[in-house]
């Protein structure tokens, strides 16, 4: 059975209890500045989003940030993310006043850029479907969920910074029908 593609998510497809919400694409968030307090208090940039493989939709557990060359990467728990704006992601300062902990991968965690972007996905029968060009996220009530993957050429263009060019409609596959080929890599 081939996974159905959808042109736009329907309200009935959303997880229950979402209330007010907004959709984002991962390609719009990657490399976005991470700030503590004000926009001028930049501490790094987003390099990946970390999700727990919960059913039916993976839920964000944190963000993976980088400070620059030869500086350690850090993991900011999702509970410390205050808000996501068009120009930056705002977080609370580290609890101990010094730094956030380094990132340590956990079982049943998935990193969007590392494990999904550009990867082949399978349909429910284990057949190859397409390559993931972008990941469609739902932000609601302090949570972020993976709800779709985008296999369209538009997703490919967004991924490479050409999101203003639109050739065709987005082709979204609900996460319910997605199985990454490999998360262990």
Model-derived features: positions:
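Peripheral interaction segments used for macromolecular assembly
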Residues: 1-185
């Amino acid at each position: 059975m081939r996974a159905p593609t959808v042109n736009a998510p329907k309200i009935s497809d959303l997880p229950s209890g979402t209330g007010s919400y907004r959709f984002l694409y991962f390609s719009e968030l990657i490399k976005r500045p991470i700030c503590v307090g004000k926009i001028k208090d930049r501490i790094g940039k987003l390099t990946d989003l970390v999700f727990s493989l919960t059913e039916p939709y993976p839920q964000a557990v944190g963000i993976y940030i980088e400070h620059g060359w030869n500086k350690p990467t850090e993991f900011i728990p999702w509970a410390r993310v205050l808000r996501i704006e068009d120009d930056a992601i705002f977080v609370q300062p580290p609890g101990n006043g010094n730094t956030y902990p380094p990132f340590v991968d956990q079982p049943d965690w998935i990193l969007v850029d590392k494990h999904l972007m550009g990867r082949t996905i399978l349909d429910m029968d284990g057949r190859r479907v397409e390559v993931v060009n972008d990941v469609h996220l739902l932000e609601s009530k302090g949570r972020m969920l993976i709800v779709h993957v985008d296999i369209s050429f538009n997703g490919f263009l967004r991924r490479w910074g050409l999101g203003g060019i639109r050739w065709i409609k987005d082709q979204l596959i609900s996460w319910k029908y997605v199985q990454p080929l490999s998360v262990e890599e």
